[in-house]
Amino acid sequence: LSRGLGDVYKRQSYNRFVELQKSVVLHLTMFIKEVLLGTCTGVAYVDSTPLRVCKHQRIPIHKTFKGLAERGKCSMGWFFGFKLHLIINDRGEILSFMFTPGNVDDREPLYSESFIGNVKGKLCGDKGYIGKQLFEFLFMNGIQLVTKVKSNMRNSLMSVADKIMLRKRALVESVNDELKNIAQIEHSRHRSFTNFITNALSAIAAYCFFPKKPSISLEYVFDNQLTLF
């Protein structure tokens, strides 16, 4: 009993724990980048998800992230906060991530060498990543960008394997869902930017330790063609 009480006394209170979080931000970032990130398998998915910091009614009086958070628009409508840009492989492992203000174009992080340095092969994204300049830039870096075609664009030939991989793009949305609903990466209780970053990094680290992640099954047959199931 005395040993158990001693362990209780050594534990930090919630307020003290939050205060101590900021001292490990750099260490946590390095641990994620060097240890927890997955390995590229030749097939990757990219997507962005909003991280709201307050409700619409409180935007004019919000002070915590003044000058940092911005208004942005996603498929669910307008929001105020930041964006989390993710690249994952077919096993649901995070290959790279980046935080930006909410008004940043989804394509902009893909021009960053640090964001795409761990990616090779095919990179599947939604229509928001369409761009000739981006396609050429990624192609020169060993990445083939695969996206759907807009209705007002000229139709281009696409292999059956690429079409099937695009249908599996919901995989990255499942990862975003687990980060928000299980790892709690998004909430409006932050009182500083450091606290926001620490919580977000902690959620990403926690997801990397999940024993079971969303995934799709890929197999290479003997004729060197890619088959998806």
Predicted features along the sequence, with ranges:
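Single conserved hydrophobic/aromatic residue that forms the stacking wall/gate
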Residues: 1-9
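Polybasic low-complexity intrinsically disordered regions
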Residues: 3, 33-151, 204
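Short, basic alpha-helical nucleic acid-contact segments in DNA-binding proteins
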Residues: 16-39
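Short, motif-level signal for alpha-helix interfacial/capping segments enriched in acidic residues
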Residues: 20, 24-28, 104-105, 150-155
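Structural motif
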Residues: 74-77, 189-200
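Anion-binding and metal-coordination hotspots
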Residues: 121-124, 137-142, 197, 201-229
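Helix-centered, glycine/charged polyanion-binding patches within enzymatic domains
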Residues: 122, 127-194
